[in-house]
Amino acid sequence: MKAALLSLVFLIALSCAEKPKPEDFDLITPFEKGNGNQTPTYDEVMAYYEDLDAAYVSIKTYKIGRTDSGEPLTLVTYNTNRTFDSEFADAKEVTRILINNGIHPGESDGIDATMMMMRDLANGTIETPENVWIGAIAVYNIGGALNRNTGTRANQNGPEEYGFRGNAQNYDLNRDFVKADTYNARAFAEIYHMVDPDVLIDNHVSNGADYQYVLTHLFTQHNKLGDELGDYLHTELQPQLEQDLAAKDWPITPYVNVFSQVPEIGFSQF
């Protein structure tokens, strides 16, 4: 009887124990702590999201599949409604946004930006409609992120240290979504089908070319796309995007590849 009472008291004390609060965690990113020229290591990214998961009910992390490095992909989700039996199979009308970060870990802007964005979504600094669900692959190319260096992007303006373009098997993952030769691509496909996103954002940046615009766009050629989709792209989507960003003082221009050629010969499109 005495043992039972002690067990009951212990359980009550345990249930009344104070849960972690956001202020119990250091949620300032390495980028913000530094001089603006640092990006976190893979282990720092994982530790950050573990803390964010513990600090906020709206944030949850999942380990999915495996990659060529042997590590699983980490999917981080922001969901203000955690009452679903499964946040991937709910019956509610939800707009799903999936973000892919770190396909080339030397182009690390998206990794840092998503860490800050997820925190600011969770703490209410960034407001979103209730029917918006956001998921992000924390680091897609884990093998490349673990292979940090300071010299493979000599023409790129920072960061001081960064990951390598090739993955653990030296694949350029930017070329493997269809072939799926790598475990990374197969794990990505698993996440993609599980989430079934309405919008996919690949946080991909240039690797040192001197673009005068912060943002460039690479739309499919409307005359190759054809029919209603081509017309929609050419007459509605692209002009609207250009106008909206110009109004925010973020003008964009077409992305082009330039390989020691003069402008007069033209630029290749995709």
Where are each of the predicted segments found?
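Acidic/histidine-rich, surface-exposed loop or edge segments in extracytoplasmic proteins
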Residues: E23-N37, I99-N101, D172
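Bacterial signal peptide processing site
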Residues: A17-K19
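C-terminal motif of bacterial Sec signal peptides marking the signal peptidase cleavage site
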Residues: I12-S15
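Sec-dependent signal peptide recognition
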Residues: M1-S7
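Hard-cation-handling environments
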Residues: V256-F270
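Soluble metallo-hydrolase cores and metallopeptidase-like ectodomains found primarily
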Residues: V45-I97
